[in-house]
A protein has these predicted regions:
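Charged low-complexity intrinsically disordered patches
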Residues: 2-15, 86, 110-165
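Small/flexible residues
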Residues: 9, 17, 49, 56, ...
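Serine/proline-rich low-complexity intrinsically disordered segments, especially terminal tails, linkers
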Residues: 64, 72, 105, 133, ...
Length: 165
């Protein structure tokens, strides 16, 4: 029996597990006050990460799915998604299926880039005290990413692209 099954039980282990980077779980200690995530925003990033199965396919849970999984209202999900997009941690991509508007897809690459920056700054440890200088550097990378990115002009991977009606 695997360690996962030993720890959680066979029936739970058979249903699968999500891979969530530790740096994502600890992200707030690396961000300044302006960029600190609310509990809802962090939970949404965890849920998006758990729905992101393949690198070249963006996750696309609906607002109502995210609301149910997070135990918050759809409006709270919308506000959280807007803020995550505005600070440059995710990108939102509109989708259509057979000409009908479908749930948004979410580009996780900006989050990957921020977590890589954090990992480069702290390759061998999980610090308890992060210097203000490091926090400023990481947070300013968010501001730089936000300034560079075009609003909602992200390209869907070919495997997820849908035909416009």
């Amino acid at each position: 029996m695997s360690d996962v099954a030993n720890k959680w039980g066979k029936k739970v282990a058979e249903r699968g597990f999500a891979q969530i980077p530790n740096y994502l779980l600890l992200i707030n200690q690396f961000l300044d006050e302006e960029h600190t995530l609310s509990p809802a925003e962090l939970l949404i990033l965890v849920q998006l990460s758990s729905s992101w199965w393949k690198k070249d396919e963006m996750p696309f849970p609906s607002m109502s799915t995210l609301a149910a999984r997070c135990g918050i209202s759809s409006r709270q999900v919308q506000r959280s998604i807007n803020n995550l997009e505005n600070i440059g941690l995710i990108g939102r991509v509109k989708r259509r299926e057979n000409g009908i508007v479908s749930s948004n897809a979410y580009n996780m690459e900006p989050l990957v880039n921020v977590l890589a920056l954090i990992a480069n700054q702290f390759p061998n440890e999980f610090p308890r005290n992060v210097s203000k200088e490091t926090i400023k550097k990481i947070s300013s990378s968010l501001s730089a990413e936000t300034a560079k990115k075009p609003r909602r002009k992200l390209v869907m991977p070919r495997t997820q692209a849908t035909k416009e009606a």
